[in-house]
Amino acid sequence: ESIVRPPPVEAKVEETPE
């Protein structure tokens, strides 16, 4: 199984903290 899926949105929270 070589299915590449995008990272979870929660991971982007670290880059863009509110």
From Swiss-Prot:
UniProt KW Secreted keyword: yes
Subcellular locations according to the entry: Secreted
Protein name as it appears in the record: Porflan
A Gene Ontology BP annotation from the UniProt entry: positive regulation of leukocyte migration
Expression by tissue: Expressed by the venom gland.
Gene source species: Potamotrygon orbignyi (Smooth back river stingray)
Function according to Swiss-Prot or TrEMBL: Inflammatory peptide. Induces leukocyte recruitment and adherence to the vascular endothelium when applied to mouse cremaster muscle.
Secreted in keyword set: yes
GO cellular component: extracellular region
GO molecular function terms attached to this record: toxin activity
This protein's UniProt keywords: Secreted, Toxin
Segments forming a coiled coil: none
